[in-house]
Amino acid sequence: MLLRMTEFVGCLFVPSTTFLLLFSVKSAKIILLGILPTERSMKMYTIENLYDLTHTMAADYLKGFTYPWEALKGIKDMIIALGATLNKDDFIEREPQVWVHKTAKLFPNIYLGAPCIIGANTEVRPGAFVRGSALVGENCVVGNSTELKNVILFDNVQVPHYNYVGDSILGYKAHMGAGSITSNVKSDKTLVVIHCDPEIATGIKKVGAMLGDNVEIGCNSVLNPGTVIGRNSNVYPTSCVRGVVPENSIYKKNDTIVAKR
């Protein structure tokens, strides 16, 4: 199914569903172009529907919120409190409020700012800059010249090459291709709005991207402030994404979204 916002000429809401169907009438035929989230479908972008909380040490913290961006303000305090409870047989406090699992692999020439937690079997590669307030799960890759700031990375997340991830939450097995980044501040410095129907005012100046489980972001893509990507969705390389992308979808160019088959 294809959605191209500039082409549809009509719409139909289907009762008992969470989608608005878009269609084009050509040669007396109705051609289904795709799906557009309605207010009822915003539940797809809740923490419950984006993430499997069994794959993060922040599970108890995240359960206290409905939408993921609501959790951003408290990440620093959460990490400090969580770090104090970690098993000292498993984690080393390398310096105040910097906890690293004994099985994590730290390469030379990295920076780990407090507070942060680096999980089991995670690699932090040369040139990585963890500015602080970063909870990195198990089996993750924080790659060369990658910068993290005020983030939660679920287990098995990979940000392996020249990525910037700020004020964001990345779900289980989310992967960002080389050079892809999250933009977390609007150019006019106003508060970030989640562009769905209806729009949601976050009341926050800095909001990056919320990536559901198993999301793939193509190389050199930019995720604009407040972008939300549903579970199991892909974003094409060099894309500029703004707003929300439904689960099980492929985001192409020019706001074209294709449902996975």
Enumerate the predicted regions with their spans.
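Long amphipathic N-terminal alpha/beta scaffold segment
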Residues: 78-123
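Glycine-rich hexapeptide-repeat left-handed beta-helix
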Residues: 58-60, 153-155, 160-261
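Alpha-helix boundary/capping motif
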Residues: 6, 18-19
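ABC ATPase A-loop
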Residues: 99, 117, 135, 210, ...
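Extended, compositionally simple hydrophobic/Ser/Thr-rich segments
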Residues: 116-117, 122-152, 156-161, 166-168, ...
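Terminal amphipathic alpha-helical/low-complexity segments used for targeting or macromolecular assembly
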Residues: 7, 11-14, 25-97, 232, ...
